[in-house]
Amino acid sequence: MKVLFAVSECAPFAKSGGLADVAGALPKELRRLGIDARVMLPKYETIAPEWKKKMKKVAELIVPVGWRRQYCGVEELRHDGVIYYFIDNEYYFKRPQLYGHYDDGERFAYFCRAVLEVLPEIQFQPDVIHCHDWHTGMVPFLLREQYRHELFYVDMRTVFTIHNLQFQGLFPRGILEDLLNLDGRYFTVDHLEFYGCVSFMKGALVASDLITTVSPTYKEEIQTAYYGERLDGLLRARRDDLLGILNGIDDEFYNPEADPFLTATYSVHTRERKQLNKRALQRQFGLPEWDDVPLIAMVTRMTAQKGLDLVTCVFHEMMSEDMQLVVLGTGDWRFEQFFSQMAAAYPGKVGVYIGFHEPLAHQIYAGADLFLMPSLFEPCGLSQMIALRYGTIPIVRETGGLNDTVQSYNEITKEGNGFSFTNFNAHDMLYTIRRALSFYRQPSVWEQLTERAMRGDYSWRRSANQYKQAYEQLIKKEEHTLVHG
């Protein structure tokens, strides 16, 4: 079986968020299952020179973008057994940032068209094209409407994964003819029209053979008005073609037994060494090195989506508890200012680093006792799984992937691997923090919790098997349709 991942970013080449981690890890796991999984992404200016040196040009062609004829170079690179194709066009991709440009609609209209135009040139005929988020949303739509009548494309199926429904790729109506070679027939509610705009995300939801999202709970949530971002009706209509498959983490990169960023490596059998990381973390943030004071951590984008309004609301009440807090992140100015001010107001209790620093993030995952993640919504979330892998117990709100990966501790049955609350309410969160702190002071309970957390499987292996089954059923369904239809 051959699968092409069409993505706008992919680790380790270009990354702005969790999508890059998925695109970097999942194809590797699929190859271990015998699938010829390859990845196609733009050749961004920001890709490190050491990667660019390893690329070799395998094709050149002209791609139509409305009335324009744009150059397209295809460069190939092999890394960890996976073949990567980079779409080269300096006009569109020689920019300092991946996204946020005035012509993102044109840039990704070009990329979607290039994905399909390039395949015959590189002589790769995938059984499935797996697209991710709005940037590649027009690939399934263009394939269905403009390419499937051609023999080369006739058997190709499409899968579209929603990583975050909030970002939809909305552009003015004129983009249809000007960039997509589509006429006014397609500006209707059953095609691309979305509240007066053209929606790349909707194009994928309408035309893909299968839609997946990144956790079973998020799959259910997005079919409701509260989480559905005005697409819940369409998603309910397509519920038979909708799957929720939980993301994994790269358990080789996030491995407390061999993590080069840690002060002290440790395993489930040597959990006492975790304390050395806690002391190092306290030292790094100028906090007193107290072993018996619980240290709560947050590694987060500082946005409202991450539930930081709850934290700001009850922060002073949190500080009345015997605890320390460490925060690493960047984002909205108001949250950056708030946490910086709180670090000054509570010296010895609060440590804050504004920005992102990979080695420090690993040290936090290893050194903290508890990890706070009170998200408003969370399609999957990776941080809670990383925390569990390092034996750091999560406190989460029951939404999306947080609900699927963290089971609240039950003192009667002794089951669970963390603590959770249901309502998006600051005092519900505060109650749950206090509950977690009470069990921290019961060593026998805490030992059980940390051992259970570290023994869990958070890898991509389980998820890759589910994707493989989904691809196989999709191909089988199509063969059945051809025979009996």
Swiss-Prot record:
Gene Ontology molecular function, alphabetical: alpha-1,4-glucan glucosyltransferase (ADP-glucose donor) activity; alpha-1,4-glucan glucosyltransferase (UDP-glucose donor) activity
InterPro entries with a match to the protein in the record: Glyco_trans_1, GS/SS, Starch_synth_cat_dom
Keyword tags: Glycogen biosynthesis, Glycosyltransferase, Transferase
Domain of life: Bacteria
Keyword Transmembrane helix part of the UniProt annotation: no
E.C. number: 2.4.1.21
NCBIfam families recorded: glgA, PRK00654.1-1, PRK00654.1-2
Name assigned to this protein: Glycogen synthase
Protein source organism: Geobacillus thermodenitrificans (strain NG80-2)
